[in-house]
């Protein structure tokens, strides 16, 4: 039986961000500076991606008050739920090259729903190595128990992922 091959997502060259709009039209952008992720090449030729975002470190650059809100119990509630996780269902490598959808389980605040990341077509022949794999996925925060601030913040949170893989060392 063939084993899966694992590739680590490169934390130095990758970025996991998000944006949410206020009811007044302002866009708030944040990111997760600490994360772990991997791409698995499955024995049947499909791929699967998994990542864990450290929500305790979520940041809205230059906006300390917004950063505190995002970490607080009304949003990510990092004291109780320090990690945001995504595990895709298996998909073909063509999705990353040509663009398409990657669906999987997203867990925020201990609540899991199936969500979809929309991958843009690659700008190179070795996506993840020679160019970023770029995907976006929009979720409704209310589905994850983040119902506070409805008068000020929209319900849609868009995750923007720009990923690179670590190169295997060559002998």
Where are these regions (language model features)?
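Low-complexity, acidic/polar, glycine-enriched regions of mature
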Residues: 1-171
């Amino acid at each position: 039986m063939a084993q899966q091959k694992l590739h680590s997502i490169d934390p130095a060259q990758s970025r996991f961000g998000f944006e949410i709009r206020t009811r007044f039209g302002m866009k708030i952008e944040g990111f997760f500076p600490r994360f772990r992720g991997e791409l698995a090449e499955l024995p049947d030729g499909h791929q699967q991606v998994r990542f864990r975002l450290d929500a305790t470190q979520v940041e809205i650059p230059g906006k300390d008050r917004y950063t505190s809100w995002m970490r607080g119990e009304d949003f990510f509630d990092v004291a109780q739920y320090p990690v945001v996780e995504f595990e895709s269902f298996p998909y073909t490598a063509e999705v990353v090259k040509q663009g398409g959808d990657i669906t999987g389980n997203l867990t925020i605040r201990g609540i899991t729903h199936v969500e979809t990341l929309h991958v843009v077509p690659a700008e190179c022949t070795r996506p993840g190595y020679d160019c970023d794999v770029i995907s976006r996925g929009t979720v409704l925060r209310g589905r994850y128990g983040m119902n506070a601030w409805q008068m000020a913040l929209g319900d849609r949170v868009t995750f923007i992922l720009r990923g690179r893989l670590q190169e295997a060392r060559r002998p």
